[in-house]
């Protein structure tokens, strides 16, 4: 068994900075040549500490950025113009992709459509809410104002 230090996240093995033991062939033929790991040395322990400190700083910065974006999203209603009939029923439904595009068009930053959760199908004009998971610890509620247009 070879003791190595991961420099990148490897699925099923660990995150960057973790010290793990793997079979010699896996380390020698896959992890080391691709730069996913370094052989473990006492000097490598210092490198592990610097990798972990950098990861913690990145995580802290991403949480702060997500909280700032959540505050901005929660405070500003987003207007969605969709095709609708005279009675107010939509031709189709509002999808997460539509919400993400409307948020970006409103100048509130870009969000991934896969992070948008619409609790119920939106099939008529009116005011609704949608949830956005910006980070695993941070989410925001967006006020949607669906109006007939186009």
From Swiss-Prot:
Keyword terms of this UniProt record: Ribonucleoprotein, Ribosomal protein, RNA-binding, rRNA-binding
Pfam families: Ribosomal_L9_C, Ribosomal_L9_N
GO BP: any one term: translation
GO molecular function: rRNA binding; structural constituent of ribosome
GO CC list: ribonucleoprotein complex; ribosome
The family this protein is said to belong to: Belongs to the bacterial ribosomal protein bL9 family.
NCBIfam families hit by this protein: L9
Cross-referenced HAMAP family: Ribosomal_bL9
Physiological role: Binds to the 23S rRNA.
Name of the protein: Large ribosomal subunit protein bL9
